[in-house]
Amino acid sequence: LPIFSNPELRFRAVVVSRRETNFDDTEEMFQKVYYQVFNNWLDRRDSYRLFIDRRIDERDRVDTLRRCLIDTFQFGNSVKFVEEVESHENDLIQLADLFIGALAASRNGHLQLEGSSAAKLQICRDICQNLNTSTLASYETWPSEQKFNVFHFRGRRNM
């Protein structure tokens, strides 16, 4: 998998359990989780170009996020732009989708179901081997992990 051999590639994922949060809707969850991710993970000395997978059903999503990250100056000049892209147009988003699918399948128990994708199972095994872990089902890291970071968000409704 290219992420493990390329020092410039990093993957960060946030796992959110609906049972452990109390958001009014998925849009509120998206905005608050993304804000916390960027607030805690962006190094303000670096510069970032953020690409968000386009969702047809949430038209204002990226504009709101852009206002929070760029227009408020809370992140200084570190966030250069936030752009919506179609995942099939961006190789890095496709790679992230692959990793997210592996994490979701592992955490939701789908890999144990009869008829599970052999390819997805192999990807999970490859990731586990590179991370030196036996499963992705409960895999979590500290925020300081640089290569393959998985954070379990345990938020409250009023942040």
Can you describe what each PLM-predicted range is?
Residues 1-159:
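Phosphate-ester processing/binding pockets and catalytic centers
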